[in-house]
Amino acid sequence: GGLLKKARELAILCDAQLGVIIFSSSGKMFEFSSPPISMREIIDRYQKLSGNCAPVYDNQQVYCEITRMKNEIDKLQATMRHFAGEDLTSLTMNEMLQLEQQLEISVNKVRSRKEQLLQQQLDNLRRKENMLEEQNRELYRVIQDHHAASMEQKMVDPSMLDHFGVFYQDDHQAARSSMLQLSPQLHPFRLQPAQPNLQDANLLPHDLQL
């Protein structure tokens, strides 16, 4: 309040055109311009004299710029429809040839990009295949090592086999001796014609006596 009062007094005493803009700590704005001019006129005069004039656009210039941008957008949309195979009846022969060439160029670019992606996928699959083969070989090696270790554990030391072989031979001989002792003693029995018992008549049946 006091500052604006001082501004009024200064404008009257100095017969000057004065403009004051104040922003309080709460964000409120206060302004004063010495009559009969307004704050807008003071700001415009300041910009002209200081060279900080804001660009002023003519309405016709703005309209022309908007029209140009709209035409550009319409042309781009029409081109997109032509690439999609739409609204082709409005095209001339030369425009159709140009469109065909552009489509061929686009197709070649798409095909090249597709082949590039396929090659990348193929390279990735080959790398995965090599990794799987390496893992398979490593797993096979581990299995072979484990199998060899198991076979070594099952094998017996040859010196131990010789030691057990002596006991086996002794037991076999002992069993054989026992079988010989238990078998009956068979003596040969020979018939002697001169033996008296074979010539004793009493031993013959009565019906065979002469």
From Swiss-Prot:
UniProt-listed PANTHER family: SERUM RESPONSE FACTOR HOMOLOG (PTHR48019)
Domain of life the protein comes from: Eukaryota
Membrane-crossing segments per the record: none
CC per GO annotation: nucleus
Location of the MADS-box domain: 1-36
Tissue/organ expression: Expressed exclusively in the carpel.
Record key words, sorted: DNA-binding, Nucleus, Transcription, Transcription regulation
Subcellular location field: Nucleus
Chief location: nucleus
Function recorded in the entry: Probable transcription factor.
Start and end residues of each K-box domain: 59-149
Name recorded for this polypeptide: MADS-box protein AeAP3-2
Gene this chain is encoded by: AP3-2
Signal peptide: none
Single annotated GO MF: DNA-binding transcription factor activity
InterPro entries given in the database record: MADS-box/MEF2_TF, TF_Kbox, TF_MADSbox, TF_MADSbox_sf
